[in-house]
Every structure is written in structure tokens, then in C-alpha cells.
């Protein structure tokens, strides 16, 4: 069912601040307490806009790994600490990598104004198995539907580094299905079918560059935005472009 709420005052959910509304639903003796946030997130041209304002995504890659809990945080304080450490280092969010994170972690992201991209673990996926695609699509659907209302999630990225997909048709079909499924479940957020390397459908063409030499890294990418402007936004098919750049 649909409920329309009249708000006595309105404020937007903001990075680094949060800004949540408390929601209390009651029906007879039953009561449910929750929360929500109001914000917009989209790409426009070469810019990412949050609440209509250009925002540079300065993110860490967070795998949610803990020495004492492996892929489960030992305590809730550990979840909060990860966010606080990232903020303290000058970042404003994280790409949640190769894992569907705890809903409690996403709550603290919402509360603190920590931006994240949602992802799913695709490492070791056996595409030749007849149940592989069905299982993956079902579980990814559950993840998107569970986390749809978190204002901290500003985009979806179901796959990571799809090596060897260009030569295998069934893998390409899965990427296409994933993108279309994600946009059908949530048309409000941008989606990258696969971050890094090969892709089929995507609103963002991102790159992974692991060069640890700052000079060669700068030489490779310096002036990229100027080259794009000179060609009117047209670049060679094999050359990626950044999804955002600081102004």
C-alpha cells in the first residue's frame, strides 16, 4: 500500500551530515518505528549530482574484512569505526566491495552521511553451471530490494573486474540481464554493470589503475578531461573516461 505524508518541515539528506526523519507507523496496537532520508542522486553529463549539486566521490574500497570476524564485524562499534576512520582520512564514502554489507552498517552510513555504492560478490562464479545465472539474479534482487530505501546508497555495481567476458557469450548475457534487472528494481540510482575492465551496459565507464608510481600515473591520465572537451566528448572506443573529476 502507499501512504502520503505531510511534513511540517523539509530538509535534505547531506554527505557528512546525514539528516534523517524518524517514522512511526501505528495500526491498532501494532507499531513500527523506522526512518527515511530525502535526497536525489544522478549523473548529468560528466558530473555526479547529489541534491542537484556537483559532488566528487572521494571513496575508499571497503571489503568489510575484520581480523576477529572475517566478513562479519565483531561489534557494532567496529562498523562505526570504519566510517569514522574513512572520514578522518579525508574520504566521503566507499565502494562496498565484493560483499553485501550488514544492514546495520548501512544504517550508520545513513545516520552519518557516508556515501556508498552497493555491490555483490561475483568472484569464483561458475557461469557454466545451469543454476548460476538464476541463483545470482535472485540473490542480487534480494539485496537491491532489501537496501533500496537507504539514502546513503547512491549507486549499484553488481560485478567487479569482468576478466575474459568479451569471449564468452553467456557471461555477456548475464551482465546485460543484471543491468536491466537492477534498473527495473531501482530506476532512481545509476548502475555500473561491472566496475573495471569489460562491460556491456553501464551509465558509467570507470577504470581500475593500480599504478603505485605517482609520476607515471599522472602522466597517463593528466589532461584527460581536456582531450575529451577537444573532441566534443568523443574518445577512442577502448579508452575509458572517469565518472567524475574535481572542479
Where are these regions (language model features)?
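Secreted/periplasmic carbohydrate-active enzymes, especially glycoside hydrolases
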Residues: 1-98, 102-103, 108, 112-113, ...
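Substrate-binding/catalytic cleft of secreted carbohydrate-active enzymes
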Residues: 81-84, 93-247
